Every structure is written in structure tokens, then in C-alpha cells.
């Protein structure tokens, strides 16, 4: 009787399990392991066979016998199958809710963050536009600053030029006063020293006499440009010079030439005293030789100039000399005497009259600095110059200030000339 009741209960349980399994088979969640498959069948007149097929293809068979053999073991296996089915059913029912809850939570989070992201994107776009606008404004400001810098540099250059003119003008007044007060006796002495030479000088050279300068060479019958030996009155040993026999009637003794930058003119005192270079090219004759020439008689100066566009100009000075009023010209610095300008280049030398010669190693100018060192040349600097024909050979326009081969009245302080030639000739009595 007991076995019959248990058999009935087992059949009912098997039917319940089978129904649950069928429900799971129709409604299991995609992506999860399918639940066990349970089937029942007759195993005899009074027996039932319950089969559970698991997801891993293993089978569990339970034989229910009314004669109750191994009843405890069969019930244990049936309870195990029931537990597996209930667990699968529970997972099946819980999984959709879990997924749904996660999806809803994710959607809520996205819905909450999306406005913030959109707001931040709008802020970034606004900041980007502001940065672009600021970049454009900065570029305009930079261009304005660069333009202003260029204007200030130009104004500074112009102001330096005006200041140089002003200083030179004041210096001229002071020098004129000093000359009027104290140079009467030296001038008279120098005139007396030159008087014999001036009075004894013939218009031509007698046969066998030695030429004192290029005018004597010309008057002796030589009419070709070139190198000749001359023997000044106070320099009997003589020296060679280059004679220009063509310009304005010829007879010019050349003492300075710049033409190609092949010779370094940024030199010291000894070089400028003794001379350097090649007479047929760039050269400086030497202060002691220029002094020996110009103390013989009254000389005039002619300066030829050329720029890099083949433009030419000249400056003529009716009176020129070096160390005219000096007992010891080297000790005095070979001071310059120049006057009576005419020509097409404009005057850039009169303001240097009365000044001693300055080199990078011997400063005799009126500036706090050494003008020769500052402007890379050697000249009769005042404070500092209106001409600098012994400056650097910079080949035309340059960005530096007044340190080239300059003649400011013609090309300003930032243009280095292509050619310059300084030459002297005695003032002829028939002129």
C-alpha cells in the first residue's frame, strides 16, 4: 500500500517536473544554457521510468517500482532532478529582470549624462571659437607691434642722424672760436714755411728736376694714368703714387681709393701713418706722405664717388691739408684742414676740419667712445662723422648704422658706396 502511494506521488512529481521543463523549453532566455529535459514512460505493469537529459547531454534515469526496491536512492535522485529544474526555472525568471534592471539603470544614467555632455560640448565649442578669435586678435597685435618696432627703429636712426648734425654744429662753433683766438700764430708760421716752396715753384719742371707731385709729372709731359715716383720738398727720399691724368685736366695725386673690398681698412695707427694696399687698386697712401705733399704749397681736394647703381657724384674742396700747422704732425694726430666746398655729392667733410685722425688703437675724437672702433674705420672723426670713406665695404644698403663707406650728404648713413677716390692737386696760379 505504501509503495502504491509513493508511486502515485512520484508520477505526480514527474508530471510537475515535466511541465516546468516544458515551460522552460519554450521561454528560456537566449544566451543561457537550456534547462534539463525530463521525460516519463512506462517501464512495466506497475513501474514508471523518469529520464532527465541535462544540457551537457548526460542522462539521469529513475525507475519507480511499486515493490520499492532501492526507494531511498530513487527519491534522492528525483529530488536532485527537481532541484536542478527549480534552479533553472529560478534563473530563467530572475535573468530577464536582472537584465531589464541593468538596461533601465544604464538608460537612466545615459539620460542623466547626455544633457551634461551636450552642455560641455557646447562650452568647448564656445571656448574654441573664443580661442580662434583671440588668436586672430593676437596675430593682429603682433603685426602692429612689429610695425611699431620698425617705425621706432627708423625714428631712432633719424634721431641719431639729427643728433650727429646738432653735435657737429656745436663743435663747429666751438672750433671756430678756438681757431679765431689761438690759431693765428701757427697759421702764419705755416704760411711762412710754405712760402718759399710756393714762390719757387715753376709752372713746369725743368729738365732733370724731380717731380714733387703728379702735377709736376703731368707738366713734364707724362699724360697717362699710372704709378710715378714723386719727391716732395720735405720728403726727399721720395715715394711712389698713382697719378690721375684725366679728371678735370689731370695732375691729381691719389691718396685713397675704395673699389672692391679687397683690402682691409679697419687698421691701426701705424698702418694709417705709413700707408697700405696696392697703388693700382684699393690703398691708403699714408698720413706722413699726405702731410709731406700738402705742406709744399696750397692744395685742393677732389673726391669721386659711385654707388652700386652706377650713379656718380663728386665733391671739390678749394683748400686741403693734413698737419699744416703742426710742429710734430704725428704727435698732433695729423689734423685736417679743409674748406671751400663745391660739387654734386654735397658736403660731408667740412665738419671734420680741425679734427685729429683717429684709429681703433688711437682715439682723438670728441666722442665718449672710440668712433673708429664703433664705426669700423679710421678718419678725422668728431662726434662721430658725416663721412666715413675708410669704413667697411658693405656693398650698398645695409642695416647697420654709419659703418660702411659713407658720404652721408649723398647716400645717407646706411648705404656703403661702391667706389671712392680722394686725390689732391696744387692750386694752380692760372685758375
From Swiss-Prot:
UniProt-listed SMART domains: FBG
Extracellular topology ranges: 25-431
Annotated site (Implicated in ligand binding): 375, 385, 401-402
Segments on the Cytoplasmic face: 1-3
GO cellular component terms, A-Z: extracellular space; membrane
Membrane-topology descriptor: Single-pass type II membrane protein
InterPro entries linked: Fibrinogen-like_C, Fibrinogen_a/b/g_C_1, Fibrinogen_a/b/g_C_dom, Fibrinogen_C-term_domain, Fibrinogen_CS
Keywords: Calcium, Chitin-binding, Disulfide bond, Glycoprotein, Membrane, Metal-binding, Signal-anchor, Transmembrane, Transmembrane helix
Amino acids binding Ca(2+): 363, 365
Molecular-function annotations in GO: chitin binding; metal ion binding
Disulfide bonds listed in the record: 214-243, 371-384
Gene3D superfamilies per record: Gamma Fibrinogen, chain A, domain 1 (3.90.215.10)
Transmembrane segments annotated in the record for this chain: 4-24
Pfam families xrefs: Fibrinogen_C
SUPFAM superfamilies (alphabetical): Fibrinogen C-terminal domain-like (SSF56496)
Domain Fibrinogen C-terminal: 205-428
UniProt-annotated glycosylation sites, renumbered to this chain: 310
Main localization (coarse): membrane
Location relative to the cell: Membrane
Described purpose of this protein according to its UniProt entry: Acetyl group-binding receptor which shows a high-affinity and calcium-dependent binding to acetylated structures such as chitin, some N-acetylated carbohydrates, and amino acids, but not to their non-acetylated counterparts. Can facilitate the endocytosis of acetylated components.
Subunit structure: Homotetramer; disulfide-linked.
PANTHER family in the cross-refs: FIBRINOGEN C DOMAIN-CONTAINING PROTEIN 1, FIBRINOGEN/TENASCIN/ANGIOPOEITIN
Protein name: Fibrinogen C domain-containing protein 1
Gene source species: Macaca fascicularis
Gene name tied to this protein: FIBCD1
Amino acid at each position: 500500500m505504501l509503495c502504491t502511494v509513493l508511486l502515485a506521488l512520484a508520477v505526480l512529481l514527474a508530471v510537475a517536473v515535466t511541465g516546468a521543463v516544458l515551460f522552460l523549453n519554450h521561454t528560456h532566455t537566449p544566451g543561457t544554457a537550456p534547462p534539463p529535459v525530463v521525460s516519463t514512460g512506462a517501464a512495466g505493469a506497475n513501474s514508471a521510468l523518469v529520464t532527465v537529459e541535462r544540457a551537457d547531454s548526460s542522462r539521469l534515469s529513475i525507475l519507480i517500482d511499486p515493490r520499492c526496491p532501492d526507494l531511498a536512492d530513487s527519491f534522492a535522485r528525483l529530488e536532485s532532478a527537481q532541484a536542478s529544474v527549480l534552479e533553472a526555472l529560478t534563473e530563467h525568471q530572475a535573468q530577464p529582470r536582472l537584465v531589464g534592471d541593468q538596461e533601465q539603470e544604464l538608460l537612466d544614467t545615459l539620460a542623466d549624462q547626455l544633457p551634461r555632455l551636450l552642455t560641455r560640448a557646447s562650452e568647448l565649442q564656445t571656448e574654441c571659437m573664443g580661442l580662434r578669435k583671440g588668436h586672430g586678435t593676437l596675430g593682429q597685435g603682433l603685426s602692429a607691434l612689429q610695425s611699431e618696432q620698425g617705425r621706432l627703429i627708423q625714428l631712432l636712426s633719424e634721431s641719431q642722424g639729427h643728433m650727429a648734425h646738432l653735435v657737429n654744429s656745436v663743435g663747429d662753433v666751438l672750433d671756430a672760436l678756438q681757431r679765431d683766438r689761438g690759431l693765428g700764430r701757427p697759421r702764419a708760421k705755416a704760411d711762412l714755411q710754405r712760402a718759399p716752396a710756393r714762390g719757387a715753384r715753376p709752372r713746369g719742371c725743368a729738365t732733370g728736376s724731380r717731380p714733387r707731385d703728379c702735377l709736376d709729372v703731368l707738366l713734364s709731359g707724362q699724360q697717362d694714368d699710372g704709378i710715378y715716383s714723386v719727391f716732395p720738398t720735405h720728403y726727399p727720399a721720395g715715394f711712389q703714387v698713382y697719378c690721375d691724368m684725366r679728371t678735370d685736366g689731370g695732375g691729381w695725386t691719389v691718396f685713397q681709393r675704395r673699389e672692391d673690398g679687397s683690402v682691409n681698412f679697419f687698421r691701426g695707427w701705424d698702418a694709417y701713418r705709413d700707408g697700405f694696399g696696392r697703388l693700382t687698386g684699393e690703398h691708403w697712401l699714408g698720413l706722413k706722405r699726405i702731410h709731406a705733399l700738402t705742406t709744399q704749397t696750397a692744395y685742393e681736394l677732389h673726391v669721386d664717388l659711385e654707388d652700386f647703381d652706377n650713379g656718380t657724384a663728386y665733391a671739390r674742396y678749394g683748400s686741403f691739408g693734413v698737419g699744416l700747422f703742426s710742429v710734430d704732425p704725428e704727435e698732433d694726430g695729423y689734423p685736417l684742414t679743409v674748406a671751400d666746398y663745391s660739387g654734386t655729392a654735397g658736403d660731408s667733410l667740412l665738419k671734420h676740419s680741425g679734427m685729429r685722425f683717429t684709429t681703433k688703437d688711437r682715439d682723438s675724437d670728441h666722442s665718449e667712445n672710440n668712433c673708429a672702433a664703433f664705426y669700423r674705420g679710421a678718419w678725422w672723426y668728431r662726434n662721430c662723422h658725416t663721412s666715413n670713406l675708410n669704413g667697411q665695404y658693405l656693398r650698398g644698403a645695409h642695416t647697420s648704422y654709419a659703418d660702411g663707406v659713407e658720404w652721408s650728404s649723398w647716400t645717407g648713413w646706411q648705404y656703403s658706396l661702391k667706389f671712392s677716390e680722394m686725390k689732391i692737386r696744387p692750386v694752380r696760379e692760372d685758375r
